[in-house]
Amino acid sequence: HILDLTAGKTEAAKQISASAFIDACQLLGDAQSQLSGVAMHSATKSYLKKLNLIETERDSTDVEFDTYQGRRVTVDDGCPVGAGGVYTTYLFGNGAVAYGNGSPVGFVATETDRDKQTGAGIDYLINRKAFILHPRGIAYTGAKRDHVETPLRTELAMAENWKPVYESKQLRIVAIKHKIG
């Protein structure tokens, strides 16, 4: 699900706003209540804070956290900023991204090695781990893939390599492409 505000006719229509955020939630229809968090660039958060739209709450253990329209805010400058100052903000639901251990083809998780020529010898125990983050409800097909071992970031970014396997409303990730004032 993508709401691209940058196609707006005026500069104001291209900027993230409270009503645009509601429009993004509406892309999930009656399943929008599943959206529990929002990840945004720090510049986006600062812009929304200037508009007095970010609220700071305190939980029962006295820990403060920010919310936007009732959804917990995660700030990460790794959120994309494209040409012309186009930011991408993500809404997501609990469990929208799966985390697991991977075992790629040819992957050797544990092995030993020995350096016989150093002192009395040095033994090495080598452990490798492969971690996987994957959006739930979308299958990676690898339809356009040149790299043999693992897909490259450019290959992961290609829409042709992904196929939805869940009903559209069950995909609990929404991207908002926008500008800030």
Feature locations, PLM:
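Structured, hydrophobic secondary-structure cores that serve as assembly/anchoring elements
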Residues: 1, 18-52
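Long, hydrophobic, well-ordered secondary-structure blocks that form the structural core
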Residues: 1-8
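Sequence/fold signature of self-assembling virion shell proteins
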Residues: 11-16, 23, 49-181
